[in-house]
A protein has these predicted regions:
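Non-catalytic, solvent-exposed segments at the cell envelope interface
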Residues: 1-277
Length: 277
């Protein structure tokens, strides 16, 4: 794998594990969708995690648990000793601080990470020849050049631009706010992962990584990715998608945060822990 893609964490394994997860063990991977593209990079803009999706993959149970973490979740930022929005961790300290802060919030080990920016999402979807999705809501959204209309329950074959517009929408009428966006992010990630991991050709898989290499970072080696491909193949048909219930409210610093309901967060933590047994 290209060195520009592989970016190991500063630790050998999670402090919440005595030993690293072995081949065939249940494991966790967090996917960060970064609010950056080529234009923002040229402007040296700060990179924050626009979407955070934590996946627990259990090849023995043949099951995947997928949890969306709202980006505005009020959380402790490990290494900064502050409490603020969880997506700030990536901006402050990249994947290392982001992973440690997520572990602090969810109380489960995070074994690996993958971060991809918005150009990368478009590139991967296009390299796959598009993805087929059924819209979870009816709404209209625009970017600088195009207008996209989606109807709830209708199936669409989307290219990279369309998939990105679909998964980023939240404020548009009918889009369902943060909860609707989280569901769409999970949809796109699930389909992209399933399509990518079903590729049997190493050459084609390498081609996808090469095309997305400037927009993709992961601590996974190519050997580990092949292992993940094998494990996920056993668990991809049984995916439990979860969202954290809570409320958006004004904090003491006059910023709006997402405050998870204690019982909802507790239940999801337990489901993740159970899935790793």
């Amino acid at each position: 794998m290209n060195d520009s893609v592989n970016s190991p964490l500063e630790r050998s394994h999670s402090e919440l594990r005595k030993n690293p997860a072995k081949e065939g063990d249940p494991m966790t991977v967090v996917l960060y969708g970064i609010d950056s593209d080529s234009q923002r990079q040229q402007e040296n803009s700060v990179q924050r995690s626009d979407s955070i999706v934590l996946m627990s993959i259990n090849p023995e149970d043949k099951k995947t648990v997928m949890v969306s973490i709202p980006r505005d979740t009020r959380a402790k930022i490990v290494g900064k000793n502050t409490t603020e929005k969880i997506n700030h961790a990536y901006a402050y300290g990249g994947p290392d601080m982001a992973v440690k802060s997520l572990e602090k919030l969810m109380d489960v080990p995070v074994d690996h990470y993958v971060s991809i920016n918005m150009d990368g999402v478009k590139t991967v979807v296009d390299e796959l020849g598009g993805v087929t999705l059924t819209s979870n809501a009816s709404f209209t959204t625009k970017d600088t050049e195009n207008t996209y209309q989606f109807k709830k329950g209708k199936e669409y074959k989307m290219n990279g631009e369309q998939a990105l517009a679909y998964m980023r929408s939240r404020k548009e009428e009918g889009a369902g706010g943060d909860e609707g966006r989280q569901q769409r992010q999970q949809q796109v990630i699930t389909v992209v992962a399933k399509e990518a991991l079903s590729i049997n050709s190493v050459t084609k898989l390498n081609g996808i990584f090469k095309a997305a290499q400037n927009n993709l970072k992961t601590d996974l080696s190519f050997v580990q990715l092949n292992r993940l491909k094998s494990d996920y193949d056993k668990a991809q048909d049984n995916v439990e998608r979860l969202t954290i219930d809570g409320q958006n409210a004004l904090g003491n610093d006059n910023l709006y945060y997402f405050y998870p309901y204690e019982n909802s967060l507790k239940d999801i933590k337990q489901k993740l822990k159970d899935s790793l047994k």
